[in-house]
Amino acid sequence: MLAAASNDGSLEKVAFPARLNQVLCIYSADGYGSSSLFNPLPSIAEDNFTILGERVESAQLGGLRTRKSGTSVATVIAAGVAALILELGFQRPTKVQEMDLRSYAGIRAMFVAMSREEGTFTTDGRHFIRPWMLLDVNKDLDYVLMHMSYILERL
């Protein structure tokens, strides 16, 4: 499960259910990976992931567009990334164990893999998810699936 951290800033703690174990806590970042000012302080848990959540273009009724910000916006984007990971795993289930991917540990491992390169931590120690670190369009699909399998084998 993924859950938004909160938009109450550093004066408040991470909201429920994002502060629970086995829940991926999602914070907001700007387009450069800097943690949003409205994020709460990182929790003691390891799952302090950030992803784009500021000034994201959103559709409204009547065809209007507006920009939205928040950890809930970031959580929707993180859920979309998780869905792409699951879809990749389902395309070739012999290469990637579906059951491992459909778990907290599986998605967490993929998010960690997307945020472990040098420079992907925000200044306050959150993990900035960069989907292109794993889902590289310049790599063959078999290579990406092999990399995903390798990550899951290390769980």
Predicted regions and their residues:
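Short acidic loop-to-helix transition motifs that present clustered carboxylates
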Residues: 8-10
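Extracellular S/T/G-rich loop segment that most often corresponds to the catalytic His/Ser-adjacent loop
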Residues: 4, 13-90
